[in-house]
A protein has these predicted regions:
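General beta-strand structural signal in soluble alpha/beta enzymes
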Residues: 59, 134-137, 184, 210
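Short Gly/Thr/Asp-enriched flexible loops that form oxyanion-binding sites at enzyme active sites
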Residues: 113-129, 195-199
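Conserved helicase motor
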Residues: 80-87, 161-164
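Class I SAM-dependent methyltransferase SAM-binding "motif I" and its flanking Rossmann-like core
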Residues: 120-178
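A contiguous loop/helix-start segment that scaffolds small-molecule binding in enzyme catalytic cores
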Residues: 4-12, 19, 27, 181, ...
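Loop/turn-to-beta-strand initiation segments
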Residues: 28-30, 99-104, 180-181
Length: 307
């Protein structure tokens, strides 16, 4: 059940609308405009002001963008701009900018040129000395990162991995020593295979955050170890639906931490000669003071390597 906006919010929105109306939108500029990643009300008032002012919109999918702007009450000429025609579309856009038109550049969802078409258009416009204006807004990678609780030496946006297995596995191996939080996008039909490959590349104990359908009705954010992730995902087919952001915690750079974990691995290797995985993890936790769940994941990895 929805509740009406409070009088305060109504007044505030009217005030913000007046502020937006007073803003200047220079002619002959390309507006790189972020659109919602799922929830329509996540669009900014400034973005709506740009959509009202522009002469045309360069977009990835004209049908999708046409429906989106219609929802906000706009009708604008659309310029098809996707990965197969981006260079040609850039020239059309540059010509219109030189004639003083205002052009918005959007992707299907989120911020353009972030794992989506748009970078070549922006590069071409800047190369010609024309103006590019970013209009801030949603980005699935940043939204997922903010809700992950993972920290490291910054973060590294990877986007989509190669679709071929050998190339994918090679890319993961190249990233395994990175201390940054790694941010990936993945499609539903590949997500289980990708996470299984991540477990093999990064080890069972590394944590992963699986974020799907962000800002939408069935949004789900789940954090666990890579040892647990494939089983969690496979346990419910609904968990494999939608659009995914996958975040992997960075590799430890601390020498003391590495020494502790190396010692724990040696201890677990000995304990597993006589104990079950669970018993070995419990004993190692008492001896080392490390967290039992991480030791369990490490013991499971050692046991898997033996089998």
């Amino acid at each position: 059940m929805t509740s009406p906006l409070s009088p305060y919010l109504v007044t505030l929105l009217k005030s913000l609308a007046e502020d937006a109306a007073a803003q200047r939108f220079p002619a002959g500029a390309l507006y790189v405009l972020a659109t919602p990643i799922g929830n329509l009300v996540d669009i900014s008032i400034r973005a709506l002001g740009v959509l009202e002012q522009v002469d045309a919109i360069a977009c990835e999918d004209t049908r999708h963008t046409g429906q989106l702007i219609k929802r906000y009450g706009f009708s604008k000429p659309l310029i098809s701009t996707h990965q197969h025609n981006e260079a040609a579309a850039a020239q059309k856009i540059i010509e219109r900018l030189r004639n003083g038109d205002r052009i918005a550049l959007v992707s299907d969802a989120g911020t353009p040129a972030i794992s989506d078409p748009g970078a070549r258009v922006v590069d071409a416009v800047l190369t010609q000395g024309l103006t590019v204006v970013p209009i801030a807004g949603p980005s699935a990678a940043v939204v997922a990162l903010s809700a992950s609780g993972l920290s490291g030496e910054g973060f590294q946006f990877v986007g989509f991995l190669p679709t071929k297995q050998a190339q994918r596995d090679s890319a993961l191996q190249a990233l395994k020593e990175s201390a940054a939080v790694l941010v990936f996008y993945e499609a539903p039909h590949r997500v289980l295979d990708t996470i299984t490959a991540m477990r093999e590349a990064f080890g069972h104990q590394r944590r992963i955050v699986i974020a799907r359908e962000l800002s939408k009705l069935f949004e789900q954010i789940h954090r666990c170890s890579l040892s647990e992730a494939p089983a969690w995902l496979a346990a419910d087919t609904d968990r494999q639906r939608g659009e995914f952001v996958l975040l992997i915690e960075g590799a430890s750079r601390g020498g003391q931490d590495n020494e502790q974990f190396n010692e724990a691995r040696r201890l677990l290797t000995l304990l597993l000669d006589e104990c079950s995985v669970s018993q070995a993890a419990a004993l190692a936790a008492k001896i080392t003071g490390l967290k039992k769940n991480k030791l369990y994941a490490m013991a499971l990895e050692i046991a898997d390597q033996r089998s």
